[in-house]
Amino acid sequence: MTNIRKTHPLAKIVNDSFIDLPAPSNISAWWNFGSLLGVCLILQIATGLFLAMHYTSDTATAFSSVTHICRDVNYGWIIRYMHANGASMFFICLFMHVGRGLYYGSYVFMETWNIGIILLFATMATAFMGYVLPWGQMSFWGATVITNLLSAIPYIGTDLVEWIWGGFSVDKATLTRFFAFHFILPFIIAALAMVHLLFLHETGSNNPSGITSDSDKIPFHPYYTIKDILGVLLLLSVLMSLVLFSPDLLGDPDNYTPANPLSTPPHIKPEWYFLFAYAILRSIPNKLGGVLALVFSILILALIPHLHTSKQRGMMFRPLSQCLFWLLTADLLTLTWIGGQPVEHPFIIIGQIASILYFAILLILMPTISIIENNLLKW
């Protein structure tokens, strides 16, 4: 008799995706981040749901409702901090996942890569709106500054900003709609993640060597299920250490002050995972130019498959490209540091150099070095 998991319509989908899926035998720990992102998403939806049961999206009570969650709700403090720090873990996994894709040439799977870029944008939008909800000083001013960037769009900019605000400033209408979008977007992200997997399973996974692994496949279960469980345990260990020992380490102290439209904080900055993009935005003196650079800093990922000039897929056997990749990593860390610094000398010039270098590496240096490597190998 055939096993039910291979015949039942629903079980068959699960079986073909997580049990009998043929996987390359040599994929490293860098391939763990996809499943970790899935775990992060489930964790965020679960904790977010419980937070939404007690949160009120009204300017008069939003801040105190978050305080109420932390003080009066059973285990409310741990739910709140798991959600806040879970977002940080989410972005760490996202950056690692995208970095893996860049390093090993996973962007050759165009459909999977493009859905991934949409997922990245959707996650960033969700995180931004979530940061506004506690209605602290940084929530309010962050929302004001970032939404105001849209006013740089010619002709329709001002009207667009007021339409998003639902008035002439960030107020009750803005908070309510941000809560609505923050609630619905994770479910859209979950649906997109399924499409992401659907496209991935059309081609099968890439592997560190970058060559086809059709001749050497192993079943996903038990080999990679057990490997993923190890990754999940490590992720949860780091997350819970953060939540239980220093929950406010990655937050901003200004957000413990209720939002006040009459008092601007000395340094307005977003959460740490947006600082690299914020630094790129600030490094251009022109408003519209800054906004375009900000958008393009992520959208540039869509160009990567078209700029692939190497005859090898991954960077495993390309030391010159590896040097550039790690230079890019260092550059992004520099941008993250600059994004959190005040706008003054020498931070301005460091930010501008790092921003130029970021685009230069991806658009000019990497394709050029790849051609040089091809010639060195007489290809």
UniProtKB/Swiss-Prot annotation:
Gene3D superfamilies: Cytochrome Bc1 Complex, Chain C (1.20.810.10). It is a multi-pass membrane protein. InterPro entries: Cyt_b/b6_C, Cyt_b/b6_C_sf, Cyt_b/b6_N, Cytb/b6-like_sf, Cytochrome_b, Cytochrome_b_C_euk/bac, Cytochrome_b_N_euk/bac, Di-haem_cyt_TM. GO terms for molecular function: metal ion binding; ubiquinol-cytochrome-c reductase activity. Keywords: Electron transport, Heme, Iron, Membrane, Metal-binding, Mitochondrion, Mitochondrion inner membrane, Respiratory chain, Transmembrane, Transmembrane helix, Transport, Ubiquinone. Pfam families: Cytochrom_B_C, Cytochrome_B. Component of the ubiquinol-cytochrome c reductase complex (complex III or cytochrome b-c1 complex) that is part of the mitochondrial respiratory chain. The b-c1 complex mediates electron transfer from ubiquinol to cytochrome c. Contributes to the generation of a proton gradient across the mitochondrial membrane that is then used for ATP synthesis. This is Cytochrome b. The gene is MT-CYB.
